[in-house]
Amino acid sequence: MNDMKQIFPKNSHKFFTFHFSLITYHFSLITYLVCTLFSITASAQYTLKDWNIENIDENSTLHLNVSEYKLNYNHPLPYADWQKGWKVKADLRCGTLGTEQVFVCKEGKASHLIGRNSLAGDISIGYDNMHGQFFVEVIDKDEHPHRLCAGPRVEKGRWYTVEARAEYNTRKDASTVQLMVDGKSEELTYPGKALRHNCSLWIIGHGFPGGFPNALQVRDGDMRNLSISGESLPRIEGQNPLFTDVFTADPAFTVVGNTVYAYVGEDKAGIGGWFNMPHWLCYSSTDMIHWTSHGTVLSAADFPYAQPHGSWAGQVVQGADGKFYYYVTLDNKQNRQHTIDVAVSDSPTGPFLPARKDGTPLITDDMTPDSHRPNADIDPTVLIDDDGTPWMAWGNGDCYMVRLKKNMIELDGEVRKVPMRNYSEGPWLFKRGKRYYNVYASDAPGVQPEQMAYSYAESIQGPWTYGGFVSTSANHGFTIHPSVIKFKGKWYYIYHDGSYSQNGEPGGDCRRSVCAEYLSFNADGTIRFVSLTQEGLSQHK
């Protein structure tokens, strides 16, 4: 294998090096690992001795005794998609033998069952008790593990320099991992990129976070000079996320002629922070690949009664009068209840202004008193049927539906609850042929976080039939929100995902990015399951 300088050349694309430090920080009785980020070209070098923690001795050694240190995804560092290559290097010493031990591990998400996400160690480095050697284990793109052992038989109490590194071969769509222990190396090849894309957790001292029983703990061992680095692949046109300037969420796409308009909420939460969504943004495209930003088209503050940082999910539709109506979720700053209101514009790129002249919301919580969740009135979706009748669905915990007047800003009939299996929030109504579909965020029994499910009907007024899952939960985040469109003969499934960085800053639960996949149907009209990928629309251009 090439020298690491060739694998990760100077000034290469998006190269990051994580030099881990340790501080004593008690949160949920867990000590966290903190790291400092700098480019490979930086001259500073850090070891564990640079930070004052109890477990570091005068020789810069961290003693591991059933202890756990972890670096959460939401800590202040860019999340690196180390798909081109990565390297982990440390000096390790085993105080006991005979038991398998994991010294350092990168946990990742593996979806072995639809909607049920189990954890698997994307990279694990430790002691293999069957071979008596140090090992590296990686998980490939198909969720299969590959373990490689190298070096001499490990002796208790002796220090070893252990270095694992991997490099992706684009032409072969395969990666080679090399393990070197005290200068003796072995290597193996596994399918796919060097590292799967997912948000995750780096852990020292355990093979699984949280001290689970038999979690491959290091019961008596030492570590020093830990260094972790990696390199991402160049961005490909059409890959996720769609927008790379800011964090975006709650997608609502609308097709007008030969152009698709994407309406999204802007996530401005700080790293690890809670929701802060002051604006709705608009982008446009003629091919779903290249996008033009039109900036802010509406803000929560445009509604006098609304809390200014709650620009929640909504949808834009074009009325019979040619105007564009933006149905949005807001927080009433007086009673803190969610409401649904509507804004209007002569142009799909705004600006939008509140449409109801009396200044009252379109939907308030007193219209849905039978909801089993508080703040039921969120996430409006509007479908204009073939006869010109507009219908709106929404709801948190329960799905509600009402007919709108042709003026688009008043109700035309009673609000009614529509039974939907496993319904959570975020409905999206669309029609294909003679069949109506409602795709929504789902809380299947015993499954978290939210997945995406759907129901279908031959009439907008039902009865509705449960169709099953559309996708798993997002790669990171406890929410997911759908948008479905047909554009230039192709169907698209759009959602948000918190596992992507923007401008060198990490995503998260409240720092999401809008993504897209192709959507297809079976011959009977049911929706085919969608895999959420980083490749996105670049896969079938």
Per-range role (PLM):
Residues 136-161:
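Short, aromatic/His-centered strand-loop micro-motif at the edge of beta-sheets
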Residues 189-222:
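Flexible glycan-contacting loops in extracellular carbohydrate-active proteins
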Residues 232-541:
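Carbohydrate-active catalytic/glycan-binding domains of CAZyme proteins
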Residues 105-137:
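Glycan-recognition/cleft segments
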Residues 75-96, 102, 119-124, 226:
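A carbohydrate-recognition surface predominantly in extracellular/luminal proteins
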Residues 158-176:
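Localized edge beta-strand/strand-to-loop motifs within extracellular or lumenal beta-rich domains
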Residues 89-94, 213-233:
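Extracellular, beta-strand-rich glycan-interacting domains
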Residues 64-86, 147-153:
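Short surface loop/edge beta-strand patches of beta-sandwich-type extracellular domains
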